[in-house]
């Protein structure tokens, strides 16, 4: 059962239990239907439902019965396993929220089902041991893909209003209706906020933070912070161009299905995890 490679998956057949500490929170609306847990060495995403912070707050120890769940390698995750087609293949016509072809699994669809797989242990706290700290001097040696899904404190990042790989930052993306629409604050005189609400439509905001003097790619040293238009801090003012910040976030990676267009993204649970210097 090789789960390596983009979009690979395997349904767990053995009676396996995973223990971890919750390191993400959806309380402020930026983390969506996901729970990240950390076992002291590596992290994994659990694809669940809304309002996970109620039963699984930050620091909560959880035990996950993995048998019957699907382990996917695109951003290591556990979620619901799709029913196989008669020929043994995975379905490709599932709704977007349950798009197994893209990620290898889907969100466990009900709270009752979640409780069958995810059990609470003791309530702990997030400690220094749970957070990897990087800065401009060590990020090249400390950061690697083994830390994807982990909680990272990026110290001394610089906000950069610039264009990298043909994308201009900050920008605002709407894809709720299946049509991708980018808006740039320069073109439309938009307020410079983490995300945006435009004509009653909520847009994801993408802003760039970097350790590089002149960022030329998003594969090393430059990171995109994506904020949902539904996040409580969506309309908070974005740090000014060249402002210095510390950001504590889940370290994630986006790639096209072919494995190209790699972008490292930072998933922020709370506005307090962004500190302007």
Question: Residues of each region from the PLM?
Answer:
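OB-fold nucleic-acid-binding modules
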Residues: 1-32, 36-61, 65-277
